[in-house]
């Protein structure tokens, strides 16, 4: 109650602000196009000078509203302006499907773009990034802003006038898409001023990635923004970076990007050398293990836990003395993955097998994700289980989660149709409140209480009866399923009944637009996995409103109430009539795992006979509470992973900051002095401080330096200070000699060398961290806090990595040999071939290793891109 009172208070404040915007807008109505453009230029100077956007919100929003009216023939409703205000304030605007989020975003985008630091509009796919940039482009161009678009495969564009001369003429002669004298709320296409529509057409022009980021507004996908950040931190020249900072971002479908995908990091990866035969061997071994005897399955956490009998059995079959010995950790992972593949990952639910490949099915949308792969060897374990060719496992070069990427922005906002149920997570993780924006027209969809059956068989029979009843009267039905397997089961049942229908699931997604377009037509029955809906509009056909509108039938509840609300939201858009009803059974995964006992008791008390459903508001409430419980569990998992990644994020920032320092430094003398000092002082302190002098151990610890560099004799030094000075001076003298030998190219050579050393150590560190994550999760079963354990281990590991980086740099700068420009070019080309992948779904990338491995074989030299180092 308090939350909704708070929402009302916010909306009341917004309503007053909208009233003020409306007043300014009415003053702008009489102004010429050229005057609006001049006002925009003046406003940009004001905002840019003081970087204070709040003060100019009313004028900016009114300008955008009038520009949209003239260039698009669309005037944002008051509720859309409210949504825009929420976005400007860094909140999540919950706006129902069909309420015009894309247009609402133009106002805060314009206002914040005036500051000059760049605004990012984040969409979920390339098509939407291009579509929205083109759709809203005329508004920004009219007001003097540049608009860029970033797509995958390195494609980047700028939105430009299709006919610049005609656009100029339209501005000079005061043309408007909205005709004079039209006072309605919505301007239909046939009533638009056709001449102005033609004049304000835009198109995409190819530009460089860097230019796209230099635009005032940049549209792109969450993946591409994240990958560009990671790629920027692998460059060998600062000028090759494309992003210019993280100022303000609006994330479309914020719940999907910031919550559902929060656990799946973006990764730049390369191939591992694990043999495919290992995965096949463990796929066979896993079949010998008996569930509940050798291992237990935790379906809630989606993990496998070996029993003592299982451990003994594994040690005997594999032929090791102790499965948990550090040297056997990889064998344990292989076994756990093989058991997961066999017992937790189901064909046609979690993945499909097509053309000899295992393709993941997105659990939230039901879409196929070709090219994406489970990480940590799990995908290979599934390939071994299914008997298809096994592709290489990958190792990580750079990684970041969406949580940590988007938290880098000075200001972050989001928009979606379903967010209120996740408000606590938005607040705790991102510091964003959720504001529920009212619909423009009242929502009249009727949501029925759930029908619960004892078995899935009874449930599906009743669903088919319900579909048949509505089909006979001509009411369109959209049936939502949670997997391909279930959509095809239902389809076969409808075929037996002779009910014509269309199926929309991951296997047929190419026809999605065509199928969805028909879903609201009279007599149409559509079966769809969760994929159908986001970004697609189901319009009612003639006579359908009179039949009650589109009827949504849910075949089971999802773990998240949000996903159910998205399914419901496909009916009753923009004030249309509609209905929704969920059919459930005690055998559904959600109820079976989390609540069948409670609901079963209720059914026994009420003496519900077989085949008879129970339908009661109290039962719907009980199921909602089960979902809340599961949402809490999932949030807890995400929070644990976030806390682990927060540790990694601080370390990542430290490493990337070090890279930037090296990229920007004009002279490395001071930096290398610090490194030599660190290398010398740590060793002198360890082996030759006080009375305990161990010259032999000191010699061994310095043996990685070029032979003959030090002439150590215990009698030469009267104190550890004298020894320290001798060692430091020898390193410094050799460095100066090497610097003179290489000549003017030395800075470039050293820069390439140091960057490659840092990148190589960071890659190895990330690989080790993945093993630590797995290990600390196993320790949690021994009552140890995994977060505390993770922090403790990674603190020492990171410290050790930084020490090794210093040692390696100190050693290699004294061994460097100048090489040709050709090698530099080749190294850059190889770096450019890096492919970027989205984890839990991991693609393999060979590029980075090839650059160095090929050169290692030449001349006994160790290669780091442009430079070679004598062994």
UniProtKB/Swiss-Prot annotation:
Keyword flag Membrane: yes
Chain positions recorded as ATP binding sites: 80, 98-102, 537
Cellular localization per UniProt: Cell inner membrane; Cytoplasm
Catalytic activity: ATP + H2O + cellular proteinSide 1 = ADP + phosphate + cellular proteinSide 2
Membrane topology summary: Peripheral membrane protein
UniProt GO molecular function: ATP binding; protein-exporting ATPase activity
Protein name: Protein translocase subunit SecA
Position of the signal peptide: none
GO biological process: intracellular protein transmembrane transport; protein import; protein targeting; protein transport by the Sec complex
Keyword Nucleotide-binding in record: yes
Lineage: Bacteria, Thermotogati, Thermotogota, Thermotogae, Thermotogales
PROSITE patterns: SECA, SECA_MOTOR_DEAD
Physiological role: Part of the Sec protein translocase complex. Interacts with the SecYEG preprotein conducting channel. Has a central role in coupling the hydrolysis of ATP to the transfer of proteins into and across the cell membrane, serving as an ATP-driven molecular motor driving the stepwise translocation of polypeptide chains across the membrane.
Family of this protein: Belongs to the SecA family.
Cellular component GO terms held in the UniProt record: cell envelope Sec protein transport complex; cytoplasm; plasma membrane
Main EC class the enzyme belongs to: translocase
Self-association and partners: Monomer and homodimer. Part of the essential Sec protein translocation apparatus which comprises SecA, SecYEG and auxiliary proteins SecDF. Other proteins may also be involved. A single SecA monomer interacts with SecY in the channel.
SMART domains: SecA_DEAD (SM00957), SecA_PP_bind (SM00958)
Keywords noted in UniProt: ATP-binding, Cell inner membrane, Cell membrane, Cytoplasm, Membrane, Nucleotide-binding, Protein transport, Translocase, Translocation, Transport
Assigned EC number: 7.4.2.8
A Pfam family: SecA_PP_bind
InterPro entries in UniProt: Helicase_ATP-bd, Helicase_C-like, P-loop_NTPase, SecA, SecA_CS, SecA_DEAD, SecA_motor_DEAD, SecA_preprotein_X-link_dom
Source organism superkingdom: Bacteria
